[in-house]
Amino acid sequence: MAPCSCKSCGTSCAGSCTSCSCGSCSH
């Protein structure tokens, strides 16, 4: 999986993840 990017909140998650929300990422 590609890294998650939460553009609306300006946050990002390094590495692979299954879901991305404002300020947090689930692996």
Curated annotation (Swiss-Prot):
Residues annotated as binding Cu(+) 5 are 9, 20
Q: Which residues does Cu(+) 2 bind?
A: 6, 25
Annotated Low complexity bias: 1-18
Residues of the region (Disordered) are 1-27
Question: Which residues participate in Cu(+) 6 binding?
Answer: 13, 20
One GO MF term on file is: metal ion binding
Keywords tagged on the record: Copper, Metal-binding, Metal-thiolate cluster
Q: Enumerate the residues binding Cu(+) 1.
A: 4, 25
Q: Which residues are noted in the entry as Cu(+) 4-binding?
A: 9, 22
Q: Which domain of life is it from?
A: Eukaryota
Q: Where is Cu(+) 3 annotated to bind? A: 6, 22
Q: Which family does it belong to?
A: Belongs to the metallothionein superfamily. Type 8 family.
Name assigned to this protein: Metallothionein-like protein CAP5
State the species of origin.
Colletotrichum gloeosporioides (Anthracnose fungus)
Q: Which gene encodes it?
A: CAP5
